[in-house]
Amino acid sequence: MTEILHVIGQGLRYPCYIILLLLIAVAIIEIGFVIYEAAQRAGSDKANTVELLHNMRGCAPDAIRAMLEEEPFLNRQKLAFSKLLGTADLPEEARIAAAKRMLEAEEDYYRRIVRITDTVAKLGPMFGLLGTLIPLGPGIVALGQGDTATLSQSMSVAFDTTIAGLIAAAVCSVISAIRKRWYAADLSDVETVMEGCLQEMKEAER
């Protein structure tokens, strides 16, 4: 039984190293993506939703659509606003349901992006610990045989894998926190504008 467990443990060594390298690669790629996204956000104005709601007062759906096209929203968000305004001829309940569905689609879009770094943040320490424990077995055996060279090599690999896993997890945790703050603000703006659109379409029916 112990031999089987030993074979399984040592057989996981190289897959564990490969996964750790992949996690580090994902972390590096995500650093590039978040820097690019931060540069885009810094280079564009943020929509003033309060002022926008005031400007939308008493406007027809087509006028609101044209107004939103001039605002610094993402193309995907502008398309959602346009689709919502296109439901002006539907009953109020249908418009509200459509708005909820579009908002859920936005939330799902952001959730998929953050899920990548969240996954790395969870797996990094796990595989780092796994990569630490696997070499310790042969290292302890080498210690019992007086083979300090093998022991030192095993310890070096163990510490390296721990560091790699923790670095990947730390980087992705920070990226996830930054993105969650951005996306929460984006979703709040989208929800506010959609509520304004629904209110103006309701007023237009009277």
Regions found by a protein language model. Name each.
Residues I96-A97, M102-L103, D108-Y109, G165, ...:
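Short leucine-rich amphipathic alpha-helices used at interfaces
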Residues V7, W182-R206:
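Cytosol/matrix-facing juxtamembrane amphipathic
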Residues S82-E104:
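Short, charged cytosolic
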Residues Q77-L84, I113, V193, C197:
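Amphipathic alpha-helices that form helix-helix packing interfaces
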Residues M1-L74, K83, E104-D186:
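Hydrophobic alpha-helical transmembrane segments of small proteolipidic membrane proteins, enriched
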